[in-house]
């Protein structure tokens, strides 16, 4: 029953086969979520986070992400980690953020790879460790993640945990620029001027 209810929620949220209706999406997701359906819990959390079909409530979003994450839902694990990292809907707790990012990373969440790298780079919830940051960014970069390329470029550019390598930094900046995800033309010009 909860599977069908979650599917109805999805159909109403996305306007698939029915008129889009966030209020009905919320209703059906909640029915399934209350029965323990992890995807419905995750979807319900998204609606609370975005204020779709219900008043925005980041505390309830975090509550439902956590419920879903505890059942192994990768997206929910990433989202509750994000919430703990940002203090959104829950008290900020870097250790809990790292715990849930690692859970999501174990299920190949590329976003989690990047954020774990960031936390190691900045010593959030863990000891600052440039080598660990580099390894996590590299793992994400191997999945063609432009944010990871950017972070690796910075590490090569400024010699964070490794010798300065401006050529490698420049190559990575160019990959980021080509991806269209962010404008790094200034970084490219500055690096070219140093070569």
Q: Which residues does each predicted region cover?
A:
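Short helix-capping/linker turns of helical repeat alpha-solenoids
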Residues: 1-2, 14-16, 21, 34-37, ...
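TPR/TPR-like alpha-solenoid signature
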Residues: 6, 27, 42, 63, ...
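Hydrophobic face of amphipathic alpha-helices that form TPR/SEL1-like repeat modules
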Residues: 7-14, 43-50, 79-86, 90, ...
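Intrinsically disordered, low-complexity repeat regions of secreted/extracellular protein precursors
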Residues: 21, 28-31, 43, 57, ...
């Amino acid at each position: 029953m909860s599977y069908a209810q979650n599917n109805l929620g999805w159909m109403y949220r996305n306007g698939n086969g029915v008129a889009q209706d966030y209020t009905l999406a919320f209703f059906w997701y909640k029915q399934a979520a209350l029965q323990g359906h992890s995807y419905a819990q995750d979807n319900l959390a998204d609606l609370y986070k975005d204020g779709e079909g219900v008043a925005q409530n980041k505390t309830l979003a975090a509550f439902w992400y956590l419920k879903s994450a505890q059942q192994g839902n990768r997206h929910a694990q990433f989202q509750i980690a994000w919430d703990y990292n940002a203090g959104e809907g829950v008290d900020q707790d870097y250790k809990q953020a790292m715990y849930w990012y690692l859970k999501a990373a174990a299920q190949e969440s590329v976003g989690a790879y990047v954020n774990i790298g960031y936390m190691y780079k900045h010593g959030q919830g863990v000891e600052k460790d440039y080598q660990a940051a580099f390894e996590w960014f590299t793992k994400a970069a191997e999945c063609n993640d432009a944010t990871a390329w950017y972070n690796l470029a910075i590490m090569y550019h400024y010699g964070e945990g490794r010798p300065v390598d401006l050529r490698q930094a420049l190559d990575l900046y160019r990959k980021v620029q080509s991806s269209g995800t962010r404008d790094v033309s200034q970084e490219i010009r500055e690096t070219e001027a140093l070569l």
